[in-house]
Protein backbone atom coordinates (compact mmCIF):
# COMPACT_ATOMS: atom_id res chain seq x y z
CA UNK A 1 0.00 0.00 0.00
CA UNK A 2 2.88 2.34 0.83
CA UNK A 3 4.42 1.68 -2.60
CA UNK A 4 1.08 2.42 -4.28
CA UNK A 5 0.67 5.71 -2.40
CA UNK A 6 4.25 6.65 -3.25
CA UNK A 7 3.65 5.91 -6.94
CA UNK A 8 0.47 8.02 -6.97
CA UNK A 9 2.21 10.95 -5.28
CA UNK A 10 5.17 10.83 -7.66
CA UNK A 11 3.12 10.22 -10.82
CA UNK A 12 -0.05 12.28 -10.46
CA UNK A 13 -0.48 12.93 -14.18
CA UNK A 14 0.16 9.30 -15.12
CA UNK A 15 -2.48 8.25 -12.60
CA UNK A 16 -4.91 10.70 -14.20
CA UNK A 17 -4.31 9.00 -17.54
CA UNK A 18 -4.84 5.55 -16.04
CA UNK A 19 -7.99 6.85 -14.37
CA UNK A 20 -9.33 8.16 -17.69
CA UNK A 21 -8.77 4.77 -19.32
CA UNK A 22 -10.36 2.88 -16.43
CA UNK A 23 -13.39 5.17 -16.67
CA UNK A 24 -13.64 4.58 -20.42
CA UNK A 25 -13.38 0.82 -19.89
CA UNK A 26 -16.09 0.80 -17.23
CA UNK A 27 -18.61 2.53 -19.50
CA UNK A 28 -17.92 0.18 -22.45
CA UNK A 29 -20.87 -2.13 -21.60
CA UNK A 30 -23.24 0.84 -21.67
CA UNK A 31 -22.23 2.20 -25.07
CA UNK A 32 -24.64 1.09 -27.77
CA UNK A 33 -23.84 -0.15 -31.26
CA UNK A 34 -23.19 2.66 -33.74
CA UNK A 35 -23.84 2.40 -37.51
CA UNK A 36 -20.08 2.51 -38.19
CA UNK A 37 -19.53 -0.36 -35.74
CA UNK A 38 -21.97 -2.60 -37.57
CA UNK A 39 -20.65 -1.53 -40.97
CA UNK A 40 -17.00 -2.32 -40.25
CA UNK A 41 -17.90 -5.44 -38.27
CA UNK A 42 -19.40 -6.76 -41.51
CA UNK A 43 -16.01 -6.13 -43.14
CA UNK A 44 -14.54 -8.73 -40.82
CA UNK A 45 -17.38 -11.16 -41.39
CA UNK A 46 -16.92 -10.91 -45.16
CA UNK A 47 -13.15 -11.01 -45.53
CA UNK A 48 -11.60 -9.47 -48.62
CA UNK A 49 -8.26 -7.96 -49.60
CA UNK A 50 -9.85 -4.51 -49.46
CA UNK A 51 -13.24 -2.80 -49.71
CA UNK A 52 -14.99 -0.06 -51.64
CA UNK A 53 -14.54 2.94 -49.35
CA UNK A 54 -11.55 1.95 -47.19
CA UNK A 55 -8.94 -0.77 -46.74
CA UNK A 56 -9.97 -3.51 -44.33
CA UNK A 57 -7.69 -3.24 -41.28
CA UNK A 58 -10.42 -2.20 -38.84
CA UNK A 59 -12.57 -5.09 -40.09
CA UNK A 60 -9.72 -7.58 -39.71
CA UNK A 61 -9.10 -6.49 -36.12
CA UNK A 62 -12.80 -6.70 -35.27
CA UNK A 63 -12.82 -10.21 -36.75
CA UNK A 64 -9.74 -11.17 -34.68
CA UNK A 65 -11.29 -9.99 -31.42
CA UNK A 66 -14.64 -11.62 -32.21
CA UNK A 67 -12.92 -14.94 -32.92
CA UNK A 68 -11.15 -14.76 -29.55
CA UNK A 69 -13.84 -13.27 -27.30
CA UNK A 70 -17.04 -13.98 -29.23
CA UNK A 71 -19.47 -11.81 -31.16
CA UNK A 72 -21.06 -9.06 -29.09
CA UNK A 73 -21.38 -5.30 -28.94
CA UNK A 74 -19.02 -5.27 -25.95
CA UNK A 75 -16.31 -7.07 -27.93
CA UNK A 76 -16.61 -4.53 -30.75
CA UNK A 77 -16.15 -1.71 -28.24
CA UNK A 78 -13.34 -3.63 -26.53
CA UNK A 79 -11.50 -3.79 -29.86
CA UNK A 80 -11.62 -0.02 -30.32
CA UNK A 81 -10.69 0.60 -26.68
CA UNK A 82 -7.71 -1.78 -26.76
CA UNK A 83 -6.29 -0.36 -30.00
CA UNK A 84 -6.72 3.22 -28.77
CA UNK A 85 -4.99 2.36 -25.48
CA UNK A 86 -2.08 0.94 -27.48
CA UNK A 87 -2.02 4.20 -29.45
CA UNK A 88 -1.71 6.20 -26.21
CA UNK A 89 1.21 4.01 -25.10
CA UNK A 90 2.86 4.37 -28.51
CA UNK A 91 2.37 8.15 -28.39
CA UNK A 92 3.99 8.24 -24.95
CA UNK A 93 7.01 6.36 -26.32
CA UNK A 94 7.27 8.62 -29.37
CA UNK A 95 6.91 11.83 -27.36
CA UNK A 96 9.62 10.68 -24.94
CA UNK A 97 12.15 11.10 -27.76
CA UNK A 98 11.42 14.82 -28.05
CA UNK A 99 10.09 16.10 -24.72
CA UNK A 100 11.37 16.47 -21.18
CA UNK A 101 9.68 14.39 -18.50
CA UNK A 102 7.46 17.26 -17.34
CA UNK A 103 6.37 18.20 -20.85
CA UNK A 104 5.89 14.53 -21.67
CA UNK A 105 3.35 14.12 -18.88
CA UNK A 106 1.47 17.21 -20.05
CA UNK A 107 1.42 15.93 -23.63
CA UNK A 108 0.06 12.60 -22.40
CA UNK A 109 -2.70 14.35 -20.48
CA UNK A 110 -3.61 16.44 -23.54
CA UNK A 111 -3.94 13.46 -25.87
CA UNK A 112 -5.75 11.30 -23.32
CA UNK A 113 -8.37 13.94 -22.56
CA UNK A 114 -9.21 14.73 -26.18
CA UNK A 115 -12.80 14.16 -27.17
CA UNK A 116 -11.51 12.71 -30.45
CA UNK A 117 -9.67 9.95 -28.60
CA UNK A 118 -12.74 9.19 -26.51
CA UNK A 119 -14.76 8.81 -29.70
CA UNK A 120 -12.17 6.42 -31.13
CA UNK A 121 -12.29 4.38 -27.91
CA UNK A 122 -15.96 3.58 -28.51
CA UNK A 123 -16.46 3.88 -32.25
CA UNK A 124 -15.11 1.62 -35.00
CA UNK A 125 -13.57 3.65 -37.83
CA UNK A 126 -10.46 3.26 -40.02
CA UNK A 127 -8.86 6.02 -37.93
CA UNK A 128 -8.61 3.65 -34.94
CA UNK A 129 -5.86 1.41 -36.40
CA UNK A 130 -4.51 4.27 -38.56
CA UNK A 131 -3.39 6.29 -35.53
CA UNK A 132 -1.73 3.25 -33.96
CA UNK A 133 0.26 2.20 -37.02
CA UNK A 134 1.05 5.83 -37.91
CA UNK A 135 2.56 6.36 -34.45
CA UNK A 136 4.45 3.05 -34.62
CA UNK A 137 5.79 4.10 -38.04
CA UNK A 138 7.18 7.32 -36.58
CA UNK A 139 8.78 5.45 -33.68
CA UNK A 140 10.50 3.01 -36.04
CA UNK A 141 11.60 5.78 -38.41
CA UNK A 142 13.04 7.76 -35.51
CA UNK A 143 15.08 4.72 -34.47
CA UNK A 144 16.18 4.06 -38.05
CA UNK A 145 17.06 7.64 -39.03
CA UNK A 146 18.29 9.32 -35.85
CA UNK A 147 19.74 6.31 -34.00
CA UNK A 148 20.96 4.44 -37.09
CA UNK A 149 19.36 1.16 -36.03
CA UNK A 150 19.12 -0.73 -39.30
CA UNK A 151 16.52 -3.32 -38.30
CA UNK A 152 14.02 -0.57 -37.59
CA UNK A 153 13.90 0.21 -41.31
CA UNK A 154 12.19 -3.17 -41.71
CA UNK A 155 9.77 -2.51 -38.86
CA UNK A 156 9.06 0.96 -40.29
CA UNK A 157 8.21 -0.54 -43.68
CA UNK A 158 5.78 -2.99 -42.09
CA UNK A 159 4.17 -0.29 -39.94
CA UNK A 160 3.79 2.13 -42.87
CA UNK A 161 2.21 -0.62 -44.94
CA UNK A 162 -0.24 -1.52 -42.17
CA UNK A 163 -1.11 2.17 -41.72
CA UNK A 164 -1.99 2.36 -45.43
CA UNK A 165 -4.04 -0.82 -45.06
CA UNK A 166 -5.99 1.09 -42.41
CA UNK A 167 -6.62 4.29 -44.39
CA UNK A 168 -5.25 5.72 -47.63
CA UNK A 169 -4.04 8.94 -46.02
CA UNK A 170 -1.14 6.95 -44.54
CA UNK A 171 0.54 7.19 -47.94
CA UNK A 172 1.73 10.57 -46.65
CA UNK A 173 4.16 8.71 -44.39
CA UNK A 174 6.37 7.67 -47.30
CA UNK A 175 6.08 11.10 -48.91
CA UNK A 176 6.89 12.74 -45.59
CA UNK A 177 9.95 10.55 -45.12
CA UNK A 178 11.29 11.34 -48.59
CA UNK A 179 10.56 15.06 -48.16
CA UNK A 180 12.36 15.16 -44.82
CA UNK A 181 15.46 13.53 -46.29
CA UNK A 182 15.44 15.89 -49.28
CA UNK A 183 15.46 18.99 -47.06
CA UNK A 184 17.81 17.62 -44.40
CA UNK A 185 21.48 18.33 -45.05
CA UNK A 186 22.53 15.89 -42.35
CA UNK A 187 20.37 12.92 -43.32
CA UNK A 188 20.14 13.37 -47.10
CA UNK A 189 22.94 10.81 -47.36
CA UNK A 190 20.41 8.11 -46.44
CA UNK A 191 19.21 8.16 -50.05
CA UNK A 192 22.35 6.15 -50.74
CA UNK A 193 21.47 3.56 -48.10
CA UNK A 194 19.83 0.32 -49.30
CA UNK A 195 17.94 0.16 -46.01
CA UNK A 196 15.77 3.16 -46.96
CA UNK A 197 14.69 1.62 -50.25
CA UNK A 198 14.29 -1.80 -48.62
CA UNK A 199 11.93 -0.21 -46.09
CA UNK A 200 9.86 1.44 -48.83
CA UNK A 201 9.80 -1.84 -50.78
CA UNK A 202 8.53 -3.69 -47.70
CA UNK A 203 5.79 -1.09 -47.22
CA UNK A 204 4.72 -1.52 -50.85
CA UNK A 205 4.61 -5.31 -50.44
CA UNK A 206 2.43 -4.96 -47.32
CA UNK A 207 0.17 -2.54 -49.23
CA UNK A 208 0.04 -4.78 -52.31
CA UNK A 209 -3.23 -6.63 -51.41
CA UNK A 210 -5.09 -3.30 -51.46
CA UNK A 211 -3.67 -2.43 -54.89
CA UNK A 212 -4.50 -5.94 -56.13
CA UNK A 213 -8.11 -5.64 -54.96
CA UNK A 214 -8.43 -2.28 -56.70
CA UNK A 215 -6.93 -3.70 -59.88
CA UNK A 216 -9.55 -6.47 -59.95
CA UNK A 217 -12.37 -3.99 -59.24
CA UNK A 218 -11.53 -1.27 -61.78
CA UNK A 219 -9.81 0.83 -59.08
CA UNK A 220 -13.23 1.54 -57.59
CA UNK A 221 -11.93 2.46 -54.14
CA UNK A 222 -9.16 4.73 -55.40
CA UNK A 223 -11.64 6.46 -57.72
CA UNK A 224 -14.16 6.93 -54.92
CA UNK A 225 -11.56 8.41 -52.56
CA UNK A 226 -9.97 10.68 -55.17
CA UNK A 227 -12.04 12.03 -58.06
CA UNK A 228 -15.47 11.70 -56.42
CA UNK A 229 -14.32 13.24 -53.13
CA UNK A 230 -12.48 16.00 -55.02
CA UNK A 231 -15.62 16.90 -56.97
CA UNK A 232 -17.57 17.27 -53.72
CA UNK A 233 -14.85 19.54 -52.29
CA UNK A 234 -15.02 21.78 -55.36
CA UNK A 235 -18.66 22.51 -54.53
CA UNK A 236 -17.73 23.72 -51.04
CA UNK A 237 -18.11 27.46 -50.40
CA UNK A 238 -16.09 29.27 -47.74
CA UNK A 239 -18.04 31.44 -45.32
CA UNK A 240 -17.10 33.04 -41.98
CA UNK A 241 -19.55 30.75 -40.19
CA UNK A 242 -18.05 27.61 -41.72
CA UNK A 243 -14.48 28.83 -41.18
CA UNK A 244 -14.73 29.68 -37.48
CA UNK A 245 -17.08 26.76 -36.88
CA UNK A 246 -14.49 24.38 -38.31
CA UNK A 247 -11.75 25.84 -36.09
CA UNK A 248 -13.92 25.52 -32.97
CA UNK A 249 -14.88 22.00 -33.98
CA UNK A 250 -11.23 20.94 -34.32
CA UNK A 251 -10.26 22.56 -31.01
CA UNK A 252 -13.11 20.83 -29.21
CA UNK A 253 -12.34 17.42 -30.70
CA UNK A 254 -8.55 17.51 -30.54
CA UNK A 255 -7.60 19.79 -27.64
CA UNK A 256 -10.54 20.34 -25.28
CA UNK A 257 -8.27 21.23 -22.34
CA UNK A 258 -6.46 23.84 -24.42
CA UNK A 259 -9.84 24.98 -25.78
CA UNK A 260 -11.10 25.61 -22.22
CA UNK A 261 -7.88 27.43 -21.33
CA UNK A 262 -8.26 29.69 -24.38
CA UNK A 263 -11.89 30.45 -23.49
CA UNK A 264 -10.98 31.17 -19.84
CA UNK A 265 -8.17 33.56 -20.70
CA UNK A 266 -10.27 35.23 -23.40
CA UNK A 267 -13.11 35.88 -20.95
CA UNK A 268 -10.67 37.19 -18.35
CA UNK A 269 -9.11 39.49 -20.93
CA UNK A 270 -12.52 40.79 -22.04
CA UNK A 271 -13.58 41.33 -18.42
CA UNK A 272 -10.34 43.17 -17.67
CA UNK A 273 -10.72 45.32 -20.78
CA UNK A 274 -14.34 46.18 -19.90
CA UNK A 275 -13.40 47.15 -16.33
CA UNK A 276 -10.61 49.38 -17.61
CA UNK A 277 -13.02 51.02 -20.06
Segments predicted by a language model, with ranges:
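Extracytoplasmic catalytic/substrate-binding loops of multi-pass membrane glycan-assembly enzymes
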Residues: 27-41, 50-62, 70-74
Amino acid sequence: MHNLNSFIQNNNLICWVIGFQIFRFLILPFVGLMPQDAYYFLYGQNLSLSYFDHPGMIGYLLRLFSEIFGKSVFVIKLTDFTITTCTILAFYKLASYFLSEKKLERALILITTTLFLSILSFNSTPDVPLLLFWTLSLICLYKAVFEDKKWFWIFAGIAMGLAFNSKYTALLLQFGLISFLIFSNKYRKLFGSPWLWFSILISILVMFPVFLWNYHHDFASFTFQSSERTSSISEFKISPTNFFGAIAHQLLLLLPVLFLVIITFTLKYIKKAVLKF
